[in-house]
Amino acid sequence: KRLHQESFAFEPASIDALFLSHAHLDHSGLFPLLVHGGFSGRIYCTHGSAKLLPVMLNDAAGLYERDLKFENRRRQRKGKEILDPIYTKKDVETALGLCYPVSYRQALPIGKAGKASLTFYDAGHILGSAITEISFTEEGRTKKLVFSGDLGKQRRRHDSFLCRWQNPGNSFSPGPA
């Protein structure tokens, strides 16, 4: 029900790209809805996430279709308006076709004229999970935007990476690698 009542606060067609931290549905589940709304950019993800997404999104779409069919039968019995699907399995297939898998620690030029770069690092959460680093130059200075959806418990996977950003050039980290 909630999906039919809410809408995005932006136009999905205005988005140039998506960066997926990992394939769990709370991070990827609305991709088909974004596609249905006009998104057609790249979905950057790791190879592991690209392999999990078909299972996750198709399963979610199947559950959504089943629940919608049940809800529409209930609505029909009460004389209420039937709900149209807000996305379809075709939207899932389109979203999957927009996925652009990137290897861990591979700097990939992105954006107009490749003026930014994307690098994924293993987040240790699930297969394919990533800490995402986007580097770009602004006013002659290189800047880095780093984010992650979830981090795993194995400290060794991300401590040295995070240490660089908290204390660049300290005794634990001689500076950016």
Predicted regions and their residues:
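An acidic- and aromatic-residue-enriched active-site/binding cleft used to recognize and process polar
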Residues: 48-49, 123, 164-165
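Core dinuclear metal-dependent hydrolase active-site scaffold
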Residues: 1-13, 94-156
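Intrinsically disordered, low-complexity polyampholyte segments enriched for Lys and acidic residues
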Residues: 90, 112, 167-170
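Short, well-ordered alpha-helical microsegments
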Residues: 27-28, 129, 168
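Divalent metal-coordination and catalytic microenvironments
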Residues: 22-23, 53, 125, 150, ...
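Pre-active-site segment of Zn-dependent metallo-hydrolases
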Residues: 1-41, 45-95, 99, 151-157
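Cationic, amphipathic, low-complexity alpha-helical segments enriched
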Residues: 154, 161-166, 172-177
